[in-house]
């Protein structure tokens, strides 16, 4: 396997098309318009939201991470908790330390914002994500099943 050089850095204006491409790979149930609306919201509310990217140096991004500051997070002890909203590395670039580097970068951002805790979530059946979190020092705090009922 050849060595892959990458740089972890904050999102830049020139990254929007690549960020959208990666978001569509991670959250493929959302439309491009939905993604664009969310991206605008993140950019316009950059005090409490943050995007880091894994830059391959040739105009391509291999991964990204979106983080935020949440005023309350289940099972956390403090207010204003850093939160990993979503992170993704393209399959061909996994197992190279890119995901961990993205998370470390986001944790540094949260510390700079005054946070003393970082939290995240993973789908109950997404064992790969749960294992990735665990390798980075995150521990499971609880499991939750969402329920709904139509009121007619």
Regions found by a protein language model. Name each.
Residues 30-52, 56:
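Active-site rim helix/loop that mediates acceptor-substrate recognition in acyltransferases
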Residues 20-34:
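Helix-loop element at the rim of GNAT/NAT acetyltransferase active sites that forms part
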Residues 53, 60-69, 83, 88:
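Conserved beta-strand in the GNAT
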Residues 100, 112, 124-142:
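Conserved active-site alpha-helix within GNAT-family acetyltransferase domains
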Residues 103, 110-122:
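Conserved GNAT acetyl-CoA-binding A-motif
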Residues 89, 95-108, 131, 135:
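Conserved acetyl-CoA-binding loop-helix of GNAT-fold acetyltransferases
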């Amino acid at each position: 396997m050849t060595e892959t050089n990458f740089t972890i850095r904050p999102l830049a204006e020139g990254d929007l098309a690549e960020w959208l491409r990666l978001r569509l790979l991670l959250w493929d149930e959302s439309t491009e318009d939905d993604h664009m609306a969310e991206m605008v919201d993140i950019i316009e509310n950059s005090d409490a939201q943050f995007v880091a990217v894994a830059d391959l140096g040739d105009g391509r991004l291999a991964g990204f991470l979106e983080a935020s500051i949440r005023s309350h997070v289940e099972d956390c002890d403090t207010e204003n908790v850093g939160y990993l909203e979503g992170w993704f590395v393209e399959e061909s670039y996994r197992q190279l330390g890119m995901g961990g580097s993205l998370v470390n970068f986001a944790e540094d951002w949260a510390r700079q914002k005054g946070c003393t805790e970082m939290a995240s979530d993973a789908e109950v059946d997404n064992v790969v994500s749960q294992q990735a979190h665990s390798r980075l020092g995150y521990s499971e705090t609880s499991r939750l099943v969402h329920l709904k009922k139509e009121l007619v």
